[in-house]
């Protein structure tokens, strides 16, 4: 595996004689709230030492502060921070990164949404804490900067698919891996024609068939951009070539990923769709947390279906593969262009299929960004260029 996996470690960073200290970034989002439930259910294993949020849900954040008793808090929105009326709250665009640098934690769970999580991710790695990574965009955007900053085993994925791969890879060595297989539910529009997608509304795109997620992740799942991001994340985490990473549609979302080994055997990780399982595993890695989620019930009849992805109707995965192979900052361009186009759809400016078309158009003009980034500023420059170009294309569409 080129570059080597960044998650495999036989012992963790933590002192097992005391609860693991968790710093939670993105505490008011879907992953963040579920992580707090995992912590609350296991007070002998985990304790929260800090919270960070964007500021969109101040009432929830205030309640979380009261319930956890933390004094280390960061809020990106200064007005939201002021409304908390609590002393010592860090605020502003650099507040979350500052919180990471000034809070002693064993595990930093980055559940922020979007590429704004890049600098907190790098700060967490620099601190020496284990990084439980739900913010896939920071890895996709930062690419080699993130993997170079990580010690072996320092990054543990929270995404269910990558958590599944990490578990399956315990069953073999790196040189025995033939292919990695990511599963996708297919989203709410599985089986739809391209023409039918023209009429999709934001409300329809926000109804995921099997998972409960935040609005942007749900939309990204509907376009299959989320699976494209996960494809890139898989390559970066596990060092497997893009041509050896497959995507298959599995509507039930029970099998989360599979690993095929060179002897022809395939290991799969299966569990009912519940993010508390990969969250608990990432917080406690390499140990499992008893009762983290319900298990599969094999006493009743059930069917697990697998089918090929229709890449003609949903080209986002192929685009991600091309961006990844292109190298440099092209994956950052892919992510940034999507964030702009996806928001434009949610705002009613463009139609649903135009999201991925905008990403494709921006990538087609992005050859100058194929050089490997030397600094965070290089990534931010590519990100900024892609956002501006996507805005121009969206404006033309509108």
From Swiss-Prot:
Mn(2+) binds at residues 159, 161, 230. GO terms for biological process: isopentenyl diphosphate biosynthetic process, methylerythritol 4-phosphate pathway involved in terpenoid biosynthetic process. Pathway: Isoprenoid biosynthesis; isopentenyl diphosphate biosynthesis via DXP pathway; isopentenyl diphosphate from 1-deoxy-D-xylulose 5-phosphate: step 1/6. HAMAP family: DXP_reductoisom (MF_00183). Keywords: Isoprene biosynthesis, Manganese, Metal-binding, NADP, Oxidoreductase. It comes from the Bacteria. Its EC number is 1.1.1.267. Signal peptide: none annotated. The lineage of its organism: Bacteria, Bacillati, Actinomycetota, Actinomycetes, Mycobacteriales. One of its GO terms (molecular function) is NADPH binding. NADPH binds at residues 28-31, 54, 57, 135, 137, 214. It catalyses: 2-C-methyl-D-erythritol 4-phosphate + NADP(+) = 1-deoxy-D-xylulose 5-phosphate + NADPH + H(+). Its cofactor is Mg(2+); Mn(2+). This is 1-deoxy-D-xylulose 5-phosphate reductoisomerase. The gene is dxr. 1-deoxy-D-xylulose 5-phosphate binds at residues 136, 160-161, 185, 208, 221, 226-227, 230. Catalyzes the NADPH-dependent rearrangement and reduction of 1-deoxy-D-xylulose-5-phosphate (DXP) to 2-C-methyl-D-erythritol 4-phosphate (MEP). Belongs to the DXR family. InterPro entries: DXP_reductoisomerase (IPR003821), DXP_reductoisomerase_C (IPR013644), DXP_reductoisomerase_N (IPR013512), DXPR_C (IPR026877), DXPR_C_sf (IPR036169), NAD(P)-bd_dom_sf (IPR036291).
């Amino acid at each position: 595996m080129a570059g080597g996996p960044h998650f495999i470690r036989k012992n963790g960073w933590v002192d097992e004689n005391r609860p693991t200290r968790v710093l939670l970034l993105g505490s008011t989002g879907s992953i963040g709230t579920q992580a707090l439930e995992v912590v609350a259910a296991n007070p002998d294993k985990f304790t929260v030492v800090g919270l960070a949020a964007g500021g969109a849900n101040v009432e929830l954040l205030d309640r979380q502060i009261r319930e956890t008793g933390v004094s280390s808090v960061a809020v990106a929105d200064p007005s939201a921070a002021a409304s908390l009326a609590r002393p010592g709250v860090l605020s502003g665009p650099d507040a979350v990164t500052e919180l990471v640098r000034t809070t002693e934690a064993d595990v930093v769970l980055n559940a922020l949404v979007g590429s704004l999580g890049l600098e907190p991710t790098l700060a967490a790695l620099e601190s020496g804490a284990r990084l439980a990574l739900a913010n896939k965009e920071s890895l996709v955007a930062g690419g080699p900067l993130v993997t170079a900053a990580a010690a072996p085993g320092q990054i543990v994925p929270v995404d269910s698919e990558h958590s599944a791969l990490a578990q399956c890879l315990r069953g073999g060595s790196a040189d025995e891996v033939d292919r990695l297989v990511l599963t996708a539910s297919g989203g709410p529009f599985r089986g739809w024609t391209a023409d039918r997608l023209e009429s999709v509304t934001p409300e329809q795109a926000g109804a995921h068939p099997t998972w409960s997620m935040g609005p942007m992740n749900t939309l990204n799942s509907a376009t299959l951009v989320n699976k494209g991001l996960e494809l890139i994340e898989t390559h970066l985490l596990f060092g497997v070539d893009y041509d050896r990473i497959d995507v298959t549609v599995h509507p039930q979302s029970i099998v989360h990923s599979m690993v095929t080994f060179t002897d022809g055997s395939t290991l799969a990780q299966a569990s009912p769709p519940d993010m508390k399982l990969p969250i608990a595993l990432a917080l406690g890695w390499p140990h499992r947390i008893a009762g983290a989620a319900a298990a599969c019930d094999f006493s009743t009849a059930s069917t697990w279906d697998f089918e090929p992805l229709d890449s003609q109707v949903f080209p986002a995965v192929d685009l991600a593969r091309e961006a990844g192979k292109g190298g440099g900052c092209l994956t950052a361009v892919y992510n940034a262009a999507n964030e702009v186009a996806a928001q434009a759809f949610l705002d009613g400016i463009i139609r649903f299929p135009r999201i991925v078309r905008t990403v494709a158009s921006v990538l087609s003009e992005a050859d100058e960004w194929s050089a490997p980034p030397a600094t965070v500023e290089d990534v931010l420059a590519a990100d900024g260029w892609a956002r501006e170009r996507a805005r121009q294309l969206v404006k033309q569409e509108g």
